[in-house]
Amino acid sequence: MKNKKVLIVSARYYEELSNSLELYATSSLSKIKYKIIKVPGVFEIPVVISKNIKKYDGFIALGVVIKGETPHFDFISSASTQAIMSLSVDSKKPIGNGIITCLNMKQAKARGKKGKEAAKAVISVLSQ
């Protein structure tokens, strides 16, 4: 695991929540080299992973999508999840999905530890 490199791509749209996701994700990566790239929103995460797919052994996608009054929530969460899954399967590299989708801010704040779960998933696959 020493020589493995992981890229964390973190959406800044809800910055306070993203910071929490990052903190929990990085707390699990003490034995792995990692870099964090910050992007404006969840929709930009897949393209940044795609651009870096050959440089890293694994990836962690972090961000928050909160349901509003329009169907935008459904489009963004579905499209980003689909793109991340396709990238992972096509590249045969693990991508921990730490993008949380919530109905309100209270739910989002309660799920800040999901970054750690995404990191642990990547570590688990990399160690196989």
Model-predicted regions and their roles:
Residues 26-54:
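Active-site rim loops that border cofactor/substrate pockets in soluble metabolic enzymes
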Residues 3-36:
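Glycine-rich phosphate/diphosphate-binding loop of Rossmann-like nucleotide-binding domains
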Residues 37-41, 75-77, 113:
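Active-site nucleophile and cofactor-binding loops and adjacent substrate-binding regions
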Residues 23, 43-50, 113-116, 120-123:
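Amphipathic, non-transmembrane alpha-helical secondary structure
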Residues 47-83:
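Glycine-rich phosphate-binding loop
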Residues 80-128:
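C-terminal binding/interaction regions
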Residues 12-13, 64-65, 100-103:
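Short, ordered loop/turn segments at secondary-structure junctions
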